[in-house]
A protein has these predicted regions:
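Nucleic-acid endonuclease domains
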Residues: 1-65, 69-141
């Protein structure tokens, strides 16, 4: 599987050069699409004309715009995840946050709809994993 090859290459790079390439975004977008039931071919077809800087959402599935956020600790001392990325806008319908382990293995995934997210987090400057864990659990290892 292509995802596994990408992860293997990134981990080898990290082993050799100390820092992994930034693949967490693309891996988490792919994993989220698979998690909500999108077929790999449909995801591939959707992404063909997209750019890495698309504003608002990462993909559309069953009429819903999905914004994806993720964290992956490097495994080095002090790399524990204590903050999570906050959505910069509300041009989406569903947000999924994924926490990976150091090997890009999904540990948990949580979903928020845009209105619940706004209500819960609009006034909070810095979000932690505990904030996102108040959403709907899509996966927990």
């Amino acid at each position: 599987m292509l995802r596994d090859k990408l992860v293997e290459t990134a981990l080898e790079w990290q082993k050799r050069f100390g820092v992994a390439p930034q693949i967490t975004s693309v891996v988490s977008e792919y994993d989220s699409a698979m998690l909500v039931g999108m077929l790999e071919k449909d995801y591939s077809d959707f992404m063909q004309d997209k750019t890495a800087v698309q504003k608002g959402f990462d993909f559309i599935f069953k009429g819903k715009r999905y914004q994806i956020k993720a964290n992956r600790p490097s495994g080095k001392k002090g790399s524990k995840v204590t903050w999570v990325p906050k959505a910069k806008n509300y041009n989406w319908d569903k947000l999924i946050w994924i926490l990976y382990d150091k090997n890009y293995v999904m540990q948990e995934a949580w979903e928020w709809d845009v209105e619940s997210y706004k209500t819960a987090f609009a006034e909070i400057k810095r979000l932690s994993p505990e904030h996102y864990r108040k959403g709907i659990c899509l996966y927990r290892k």
